[in-house]
Amino acid sequence: MDNEKGTVIITSHHRNQTNHHYDTCPICYTRPGMPLVPPLNFAMIASGVYRSGHPNKQNFAFLRKLGLKTIMYFAMEDYPPEMQHFVEQEGIEVLHYKTEGNKEPFIEVNHEDISHALVKLLDKRSHPVLIHCLKGKHRIGCLVGCLRKIQRWSMTSIFDEYRKFAGTKVLADQEFIETFNHDQVPYDYEHRPGWL
């Protein structure tokens, strides 16, 4: 369903609690004993909050171990069928922020999308949550940088973490993070996570 901000919300209320039938769904499930492979650029941001690039079917067993309730996806592209099937089978709420890549200087990050995503990230009822874009670098780096401002990190530490994932060409993103007004994010104080 689309809302007025252009965010697509996909909700599935089905959470498969039974044993998975590996032979009937080879796309979504690996067999027992298969290695757990994290998505590209995977990292834990805080307890119950993870970041990465776009997951693929080799990552599904790993993601299942996280017990995700929510996924926030920042990209223009829709999920491929195998990813859509996975989130439906697992009962994961997906918030799809239709956002262009912001590596180019003329592409701006959408302040409303970042604020909306931060409200969800700061609500422990959404946890565990995975935030991802295609490569887990620039768009997610901006979101994490804004989260770190709310956590009162120094700008030096925020930019060091950003460059760890995105590299050195970050001038526009640094400016976005630096000027983002984190005091205007209306999160629910009662349901804030313990790390805030």
Language-model region placement:
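Cys-dependent protein tyrosine phosphatase-like superfamily
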Residues: 1-131, 135, 142-196
